[in-house]
């Protein structure tokens, strides 16, 4: 390995990577992935599933309509299908049935799968105590696999969930990550029992787990870093044909190598769009496609749903921005004519525009999605506002909830009060200036870009390095993309793009000074020639 540049050494140090850990961090390998048996109850879950295979009982994988749920469902369906099992997939409908094992979704699952003997949940089920009991009363066995926080009572069945058993090494797995470990345990046991003698299934399943890990915004450290890095390395050779077809429709020109952005910004949002706008079943057909024709048709549909999602999102964002309350400690924006499936994205987009960033809730028809900046736990804020809510759930940075009838205004007031107290706990020193290093144009070389790539995969827990350049010269400012949603320009002569900020083109053109401080990330590009491009984060 060539000598690490001083700037890269500083980046590694800022991420807490010691000298002894640099090689492992820069070269994540499946050899360092912990064995599935270290995840409590994975053995019991695999035995229950193989018992159903041997008895030729019908198995239903009960998933979710988002990317994590779709990928987790596909992982277990692909695995069990390879064994010749009688297996079907079931995904609830977001708008009519809601998340997880609701009464309506369980009823439809039973109607569509008469004679089902075993239900295996993925990415849901940990809080479905009553519906698990209902299924058992009907003579249906249940295995719950999930990664969400449990309530006070666990379902009365085999449960595989790192949030329950607390194995530190697996604590940040997503639903598909849990399913991937279970699938590996299934294959090992099936081979030992003579139920499977075919080729390795690891490649396609790994790609699905890596995609879900990035899209579900899991920390990309430890086991997750290995999963995602190896999934990206194997994408071209092992990705399911549907994902490769979708990537060909979504990818930009000049891509040098696969990065976490391919998962987080190209594939993941498109798969999520199907569940948001129409049905997660459309995305599931994509990732389970076996032929090129089937894959291409499914990719066309999913890509079209993403276009629909963008149009709906843009209209909702414009309406939401018009309802912002200046200086409020939190924003609760009621959009009665919006689309519930896009509320979370719009909340995130609004939060990105806030300075300083504050928690944002977008409510559509009484159902809301919340997003919060670092340092504020939005789930805790919702809990403290619970008297105005029917239910809520989620994570520190993102959550969902339902508001009691006629209580949006009261909830807005209480939520803002709670967040004002939480915001005060985030001190200015913790926020910093958002820059990893201030650089000059001479620092921005291909060599630096190549070294930055070695820090991939970027995401939660391992953010992409943000550089700053003072007194940069801005030229050739112009809109980019469909309807001018993005902004293209040169910064000191270097090609640059500011995604999603086509709205400031005219403002920058009218600016009395074309010399500004610019924050950005760096990328390699082979479009036209091998060169460095900048991705703008902020112009000050």
Predicted region positions:
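Hydrophobic helix-and-loop "lid/oligomerization" segment in the mid-to-C-terminal part
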Residues: 2-117, 138-139, 188-413, 480
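A residue-level signal for conserved active-site and pocket-lining positions in enzyme catalytic cores
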Residues: 12, 120, 272, 452, ...
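Mid-to-C-terminal polyanion-binding domains and interfaces
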Residues: 54-57, 294-334, 376, 383-540
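Structured core elements
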Residues: 60-61, 121, 131, 143-144, ...
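Active-site cavity-forming subdomains of large catalytic enzyme subunits
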Residues: 107-176, 180-196
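Internal, well-ordered alpha-helical segments in soluble enzyme and binding-protein domains
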Residues: 128-131, 156, 174-178, 182, ...
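A short acidic, amphipathic alpha-helical/loop segment
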Residues: 130-135, 331, 346-349, 447, ...
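Histidine-centered active-site/metal-ligand motif
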Residues: 147-148, 162, 339, 395, ...
